[in-house]
Amino acid sequence: MSREAGSCRVGTGARARSRKPKKPHYIPRPWGKPYNYKCFQCPFTCLEKSHLYNHMKYSLCKDSLSLLLDSPDWACRRGSTTPRPHAPTPDRPGESDPGRQPQGARPTGAAPAPDLVVADIHSLHCGGGPKSRAKGSPGPPPPVARATRKGPGPSGLLPESWKPGMGGDPRGVGAGDMASAGPEGSVPCYPPPAPGEFPEAHSLHLSLLGVNYPLSPGLFSYLGPSLAAAAHVPFLASASPLLPPATAFPAVQPPQRPTPAPRLYYPLLLEHTLGLPAGKAALAKAPVSPRSPSGTPAPGLLKVPVPGLGPWPRVTPRDPGQEGELERAAQSDPRRRLSLGSRLELPKASPSLTRFCSRSSLPTGSSVMLWPEDGDPGGPETPGPEGPLPLQPRGPVPGSPEHVGEDLTRALGDYARVEQRLGQLGPAGGLAPRPLREQLGKIRLELLTIHQALEQAVRPPDAPLDLSVKRAPAKGPQALGEAWGRPELGPVLTGGTPEPPGMLGPAAPQPFSGHTTKCEADSSVPPPGLPLAAPDDPVIPGSGWGTCVATRSSQTPEAVCGLQSPQGAEV
């Protein structure tokens, strides 16, 4: 059906402008109100489905209000002509499409024509003058005259919240009705008002900490002065129409406790651990960081001791007896450390993993060997360079002197750090920890004496270690005992590249027990990518499997086969 045939039924009033683009005869929703329908190619949104239908049907995106208001033609007329909101109500279904209703069939009280100045603005924008209308239909009155002609028609149908404010002052309207009141009593719908004109946004607080969270001025001060203002809403790219200016935020009451200083909150840690006030803790924090070694933990946190540090730091005031003890401890510490030339510089958990991997590649041994103590294998019981590593058939159990000496060394390190903290915090915090420091010094001297006695007890002789001496009776075959007791094994272990302590410790030969547990049977299998080494293979430095290769390289092939055979089998 042609357009002429379709427009014949409409009437003579609409036939004259049937081929012309339809005017936007409605105002979209006021800014700030929810919407149900939105155009997908322009910012038009409305609560009425028929309005969006007309918008899409007549391709009104180029004529929509949001685009019209941006034009310079509308910018010069904005002060004189201000559109009134027209209520989209279901009582007037014919007005959603004015082309399907004759002009003479309008209610008498209603304003004649589409009751908006937007049509005139559109006509001025596109054609440069009022549109030619059907004969007999009066032209649109001026806005001032239209304001006086309000009858019981459209203004009676307006919802209560959409009526313009009666006071005339936009600031006199309540904040809840600000967005819903008409443009004569408030800010216009489009474009969104300036941040200072919309008072409802003054209660909006968006920050990283949540909505309506009180923002203190120095909360984001660690970002710098330029970023501190933008840090309140970093997640909104175009937050300028939503946020008020910086003066719109109400002045936050200063809290009783000041905002923590932005240096990683170390004064808070000191305050919680040592019970200092916040200001004194911030003063006491300053001399701690430059003097402490590179591996020391945060000040005030004395949870995990670090045994791999250098000599213990010296405290400020001390009597000569304690100074001498500290010097001896500082001299004995590097000697113990430097005996291990290739000791891995790893975190504390890594040597235990290395120890477990190297032991899992050993031949089958006792279960006490597979699950040793929790101490650090690079502990202070390691001897000096004058003798090789003491290899014991059984790993040190928790009651052994090695374990006790390791615990004593950790306790000594803890006491040294506590004394250092107290010596540095004493003048700054105004405390007097002199009695506590003296008592800690006495305890540390006693621990040092016990530790040195234990170290002298476990120090091996200077001769090469004779591995034929066993503490447990040999239950395995005699050939294996002879193979393990060869004197060439000592030079293989002591000469060459020094291994990390976790690597060398498991290489001690274990007498085979009568039965094999599942864990030992699993650990007797070599790694899948590494075949069994021939007797002339070199020692792989730094790997746990190389220790076993070095151990087997000085043995006969029969002994190597006996190591990999089940325990009940004959060699």
Curated annotation (Swiss-Prot):
Regions of compositional bias (Polar residues) in chain numbering: 351-367
Q: Name one Pfam family in it.
A: zf-C2H2_7
Biased region (Basic residues) positions are 16-26
Q: Output compositional bias ranges, type Basic and acidic residues.
A: 316-336
Q: Where is the composition biased (Gly residues)?
A: 165-175
The ranges of region (Disordered) come to: 1-27, 79-187, 286-402, 476-571
The domain of life for this entry's organism is Eukaryota
Where does the record place Pro residues bias? 380-399
This protein's name: Proline-rich protein 35
The scientific name of the source species is Homo sapiens
Source lineage: Eukaryota, Metazoa, Chordata, Craniata, Vertebrata
